[in-house]
């Protein structure tokens, strides 16, 4: 997605060979116009999948998930990383290791909002080692719902998360795929796309 790649190049900051800071438009301050375009792109890519619900993880996945849900006309449920006083019982739970924060979180979804009738699109801001996506998949599978695919805003293609998911037969659609963050520079995977007529 060209507009996203331009935003990454202009406003993203490479902190190391593994870490890209995009807090200027995605995971702290949010650019709503960009999020709207991201939502439209996810909706376009998954429109034939009969999505009934979008699942994401708090907090950076919420904005792109909501915009995609708006385009698809479905609801969003986000996995919580912390226990809530209002959500104590009747939860699906999975453990997720955060590459960025270097910690393991228990994530949870209420059983009241997802079930076997749902066809789910998982959306997240980043895909690195795949732990968040695998945790979200576990929650969806615990509910008996089916997974239509995973939409990722930025994939670090030099890490193995995307490869692991695709090897499991999961459809992964990434809007920006980064080949490298070496030498303080973002290098994108060159994708050849065929026009569908």
Curated annotation (Swiss-Prot):
It is found in: Cytoplasm. It is an enzyme of class 2 (transferase). Its EC number is 2.4.2.22. GO terms for cellular component: cytoplasm. SUPFAM superfamilies: PRTase-like (SSF53271). It catalyses: XMP + diphosphate = xanthine + 5-phospho-alpha-D-ribose 1-diphosphate. CDD domains: PRTases_typeI. Xanthine binds at residues 20, 27, 156. Coiled coil: none annotated. The keyword Nucleotide-binding does not apply. One of its GO terms (molecular function) is xanthine phosphoribosyltransferase activity. InterPro entries: PRibTrfase_dom, PRTase-like, Pur/Pyrimidine_PRTase, Xanthine_PRibTrfase. Belongs to the purine/pyrimidine phosphoribosyltransferase family. Xpt subfamily. Homodimer. Converts the preformed base xanthine, a product of nucleic acid breakdown, to xanthosine 5'-monophosphate (XMP), so it can be reused for RNA or DNA synthesis. NCBIfam families: PRK09219.1, XPRTase. This is Xanthine phosphoribosyltransferase. It comes from Bacillus cereus (strain ZK / E33L).
């Amino acid at each position: 997605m060209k507009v996203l790649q331009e935003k990454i190049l202009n406003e993203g900051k490479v902190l190391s060979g593994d870490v890209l800071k995009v807090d200027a438009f995605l995971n702290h301050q949010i650019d709503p116009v960009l999020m709207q375009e991201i939502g439209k792109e996810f909706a376009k890519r998954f429109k034939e999948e009969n999505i009934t619900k979008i699942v994401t993880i708090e907090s950076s996945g919420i904005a792109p998930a909501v915009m995609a849900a708006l385009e698809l006309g479905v609801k969003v449920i986000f996995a919580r990383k912390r226990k809530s006083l209002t959500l104590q019982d009747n939860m699906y739970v999975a453990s997720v290791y955060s590459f960025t924060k270097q910690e393991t979180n228990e994530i949870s979804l209420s059983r009241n909002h997802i079930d076997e009738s749902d066809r789910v699109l998982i959306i997240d801001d980043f895909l690195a080692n795949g732990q968040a996506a695998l945790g979200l998949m576990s929650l969806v599978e615990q509910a008996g719902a089916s997974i239509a695919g995973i939409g990722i805003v930025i994939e670090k293609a030099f890490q193995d998360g995307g490869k692991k998911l695709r090897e499991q037969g999961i459809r992964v659609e990434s809007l920006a795929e980064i080949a490298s963050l070496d030498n303080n520079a973002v290098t994108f995977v060159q994708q050849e796309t065929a026009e569908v007529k």
